[in-house]
């Protein structure tokens, strides 16, 4: 993304060389230059009739990126796209990381003499797309602002498509990074100084996904300016009512972001009607690597939801519910009472399955009312958007009545917020036809009888022959001339024709228009008026419908706050129904959640793997951790035996439990976990000059420096990225640190290949050995995937190599070398560290034989 910004700046430096000699440039191009100056580094789409045109470097860029023809007019490079198909082209550019400024004709060319006025009406960028194929129904599209005041980081993030606006503050850059990884903002706003000082933050995030960064001068984040902008926007006297008292950094970020969107990007922000603050301490902390390693929302394999925790538990019926479930997965709760409320709601729904079935069918009728309402408020809504909103609210009253029959305080509380908004719905249904056109002017939008003049114009436009027949009958009766005819031609328009022998019967108010050989043609004021109506009917229909629709949209927009309250309540209920269905489908049970210090799981299962491998019976496993004798479970066993699956399984069950979900286990009792850390596998970070081992140690250091006695730590194969002795030493000391360091005594699952670490159980209180059971028969093994108590001194590496398909010659030689090592190294006495009570530093006995040298001695 930074390369993209540099590319644009280079284009602009060339562009600035163009002279603006007014004597040599047309008025229209002067207008273009003014718009381009306002657009800045964005590609300018300049409206000219039915096309958007791009000039100079923008034209070159458009031609290259969209493979369009590049032409010239008076030596000015230009390229254009049709107005009606522009959305697809804009989406392609935004997907490539560009910003697109839209300069529209703000006057009607038919009513304007001379040059039509044009202005930049909006700027489209990754974080500001509103009606685009780039948007995912299941994910938010956040635009974030970052500032730092003293030692405090301020974060504000906004989804223009839903109206969600949040702020928070952080004291540690690592905490901020974890939160940004959770949010995945599509675009950032910050100061030049912040971007330069915290470049590593953006660089680290870019390892995961692409985004756009915009910078402003420092003064544009000044507190008083940001504070006043928010006060004026929300029309309040103080920000305390939003919970922002004393949050200087957050206010600076929030005010600067809204100001930037309105003043620089020309975006409507009137639909942003509230701002909410939160603290990351309200939720379980899941750092960046934990979210990634546990595949909470994105698969490591292809980045999709498939084979992730979210993919399993998200069975929501509405887009609002899907987006909320995404947040629930990444923000497990810490308050026991809140978890119990969700649990009780799930149990109540399970007890009323017939109601759940009805609710699901009703929820299918509900569209994305959150985003529909934002389009209404921002004046982007089409007739179809309004009718979709109408049909989405039709089942709300019935949904509410069903929910109020379920004995759950949590469900009833949210059901009460389901206002069917009958007046709003009547506004829409009384005005709009059930199947309106996609856009105004492309067909009938308003109902018959809604507007008298509109009905008359439609009748004129679509039924002129019938009108002429009726009028002819009327005039014949008035004049008594039975042969009188009413006709029309393009040259003279409408006329009344009578034969010459009937001329004396014509009334005085008839006006002679044309004389023919055998007849006379007349017009009347009524016929003249009708002719005028017919000739301008379509234009007038479009004008009236536009006025009516604009007024209707404003009236519906007045219900924005009410609609969003309904949307949020529906989303929460949708999520709870989803968790209910998952619990029923996969036989989950309700865990006991409290503030105790134990973590007990009986017959736990991996929530994702058991759904993927339905053809195999999943082997359940138990877990027992506490803050006394079972603080660290040391798990040994071969690769492919199921250690990593078990580690992830425990972490995922804990996360599910604190979401408020039931869990895949026979029983579970979980004391609140404040943070989950995982160190599972490593990938070389060569782009940043970091080896596998450096990444491993950096992540381990983060865990040791931030874990608490309430945390859950998952460590898989610590120390494997270096030599054997270094690896054993580091793994031992890490385990010992977690067992003995006050305030860091986290509940820990520690999987390792180093059988030497099993000695920890004898030497340090709190360590308990477990291993993955293996069945041996002759020279073959079977992985039982069962975690059992006790250590093991066998790695079965050669057996795993056989399963992987290594040549037999390699396997035979490996076996010879292994026997040689075991014979000569006396491995069982090679590593027996002892702890010094004073220094808590391990002392290691030097091995009697050098493994590596001995291997090559003959």
Swiss-Prot record:
Pfam families the record matches: MutS_I, MutS_II, MutS_III, MutS_IV, MutS_V
UniProt entry keywords in alphabetical sequence: ATP-binding, DNA damage, DNA repair, DNA-binding, Nucleotide-binding
Keyword DNA-binding: yes
Gene3D superfamilies: 1.10.1420.10, DNA repair protein MutS, domain I, MutS, connector domain, P-loop containing nucleotide triphosphate hydrolases
A GO MF label: ATP binding
GO biological process, one term: mismatch repair
Binding site for ATP: 637-644
Xref: SMART domains: MUTSac (SM00534), MUTSd (SM00533)
Keyword Cell division applies: no
Recorded superkingdom: Bacteria
Gene Ontology annotations for the cellular component aspect, listed alphabetically: cytosol
Protein family (similarity comment): Belongs to the DNA mismatch repair MutS family.
HAMAP family, per the entry: MutS (MF_00096)
Function: This protein is involved in the repair of mismatches in DNA. It is possible that it carries out the mismatch recognition step. This protein has a weak ATPase activity.
Protein name: DNA mismatch repair protein MutS
Native organism: Protochlamydia amoebophila (strain UWE25)
Gene transcribed to yield this protein: mutS
């Amino acid at each position: 993304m930074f390369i993209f910004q540099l590319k644009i700046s280079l284009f602009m430096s060339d562009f600035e060389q163009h002279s603006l000699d007014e004597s040599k440039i047309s008025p229209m191009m002067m207008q273009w230059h003014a718009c381009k100056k306002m657009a800045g580094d964005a590609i300018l789409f300049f409206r000219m009739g039915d096309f958007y045109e791009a000039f100079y470097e923008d034209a070159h860029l458009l031609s290259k990126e969209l493979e369009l023809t590049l032409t010239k007019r008076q030596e000015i490079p230009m390229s254009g796209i049709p107005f009606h198909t522009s959305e697809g082209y804009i989406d392609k550019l935004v997907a490539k990381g560009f910003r697109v400024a839209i300069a529209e004709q703000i006057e009607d060319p038919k009513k304007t003499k001379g040059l039509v006025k044009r202005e930049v009406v909006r700027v489209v960028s990754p974080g500001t797309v509103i009606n685009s194929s780039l948007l995912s129904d299941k994910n938010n599209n956040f635009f974030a602002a970052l500032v730092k005041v003293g030692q405090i980081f301020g974060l504000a993030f906004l989804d223009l498509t839903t109206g969600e606006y949040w702020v928070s503050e952080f004291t540690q850059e690592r905490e901020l990074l974890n939160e940004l990884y959770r949010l995945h903002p599509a675009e950032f706003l910050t100061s030049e100084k912040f971007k330069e000082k915290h470049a590593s933050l953006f660089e680290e995030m870019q390892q995961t996904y692409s985004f756009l960064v915009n910078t402003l001068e420092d003064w544009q984040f000044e507190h008083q300016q940001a504070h006043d902008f928010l006060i004026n926007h929300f029309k309040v006297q103080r920000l305390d009512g939003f919970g922002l008292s004393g949050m200087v950094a957050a206010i600076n970020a929030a005010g600067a972001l809204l100001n930037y969107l309105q003043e620089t990007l020309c975006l409507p922000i009137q639909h942003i009607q509230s701002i909410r603050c939160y603290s990351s301490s309200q939720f379980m902390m899941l750092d960046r690597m934990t979210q990634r390693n546990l595949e909470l929302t994105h698969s490591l394999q292809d980045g999709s939801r498939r084979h992730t925790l979210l993919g399993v538990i998200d069975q929501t019926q509405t887009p609002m519910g899907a987006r909320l479930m995404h947040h629930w997965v990444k923000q497990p709760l810490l308050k026991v009472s809140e978890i119990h409320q969700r649990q009780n709601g799930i149990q109540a729904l399970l007890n009323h399955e017939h109601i759940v079935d009805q609710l699901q069918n009703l929820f299918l009728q509900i569209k994305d009312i959150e985003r529909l309402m934002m389009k209404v408020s921002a004046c982007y809504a089409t007739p179809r958007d309004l009718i979709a909103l109408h049909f989405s609210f039709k089942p709300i009253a019935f949904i509410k009545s069903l929910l109020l029959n379920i004995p759950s305080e949590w469900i009833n509380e949210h059901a009460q917020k389901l206002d069917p908004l009958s007046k709003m719905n009547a506004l829409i249904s009384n005005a709009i036809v059930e199947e309106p056109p996609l856009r105004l002017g492309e067909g009938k939008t308003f109902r018959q009888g809604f507007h008298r003049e509109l009905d008359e114009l439609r009748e004129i436009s679509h039924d002129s022959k019938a009108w002429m027949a009726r009028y002819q009958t009327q005039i014949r009766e008035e004049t008594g001339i039975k042969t009188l005819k009413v006709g029309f031609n393009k040259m003279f328009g409408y006329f009344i024709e009578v034969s010459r022998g009937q001329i004396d019967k014509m009334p005085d108010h008839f006006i002679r228009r044309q004389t023919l050989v055998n007849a006379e043609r007349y017009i009347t004021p009524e016929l003249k008026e009708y002719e005028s109506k017919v000739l301008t009917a379509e234009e007038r229909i479009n004008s009236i419908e536009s006025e009516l629709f604009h007024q209707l949209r404003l009236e519906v927009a007045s219900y924005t706050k009410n609609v969003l309250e309904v949307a949020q309540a529906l989303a929460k209920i949708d999520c709870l129904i989803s968790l209910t269905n998952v619990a029923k489908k996969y036989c989950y049970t309700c865990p006991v959640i409290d503030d105790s210090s134990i973590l007990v799981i009986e017959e736990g299962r991996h929530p994702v793997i058991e759904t993927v491998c339905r053809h195999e019976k999943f082997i359940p496993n138990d877990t027992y951790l506490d803050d006394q004798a079972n603080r660290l479970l040391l798990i040994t066993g071969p690769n492919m035996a199921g250690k990593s699956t078990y580690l992830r399984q425990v972490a995922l069950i804990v996360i599910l439990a604190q979401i408020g979900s039931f869990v895949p286990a026979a029983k579970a009792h979980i004391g609140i976990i404040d943070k989950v850390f995982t160190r599972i596998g490593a990938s070389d970070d060569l782009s940043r000059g970091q080896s596998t081992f450096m990444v491993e140690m950096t992540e381990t250091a983060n865990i040791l420096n931030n874990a608490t006695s309430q945390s859950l730590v998952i460590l898989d194969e610590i120390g494997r990225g270096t030599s054997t002795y270094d690896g054993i030493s580091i793994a031992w000391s890490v385990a010992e640190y977690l067992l003995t360091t006050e305030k860091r005594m986290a509940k820990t699952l520690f999987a390792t290949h180093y059988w030497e670490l099993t000695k920890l159980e004898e030497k340090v209180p709190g360590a308990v050995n477990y291993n993955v059971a293996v069945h041996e028969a002759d020279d073959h093994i079977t992985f039982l995937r069962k975690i059992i108590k006790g250590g093991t001194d066998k790695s079965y590496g050669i057996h795993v190599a056989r399963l992987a398909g290594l040549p037999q010659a390699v396997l035979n030689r490996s076996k010879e070398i292994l026997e040689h090592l075991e014979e000569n190294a006396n491995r069982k006495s090679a590593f027996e560290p002892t702890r010094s009570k004073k220094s808590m530093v391990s002392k290691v006995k030097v091995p009697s034989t050098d493994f590596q040298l001995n291997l090559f001695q003959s």
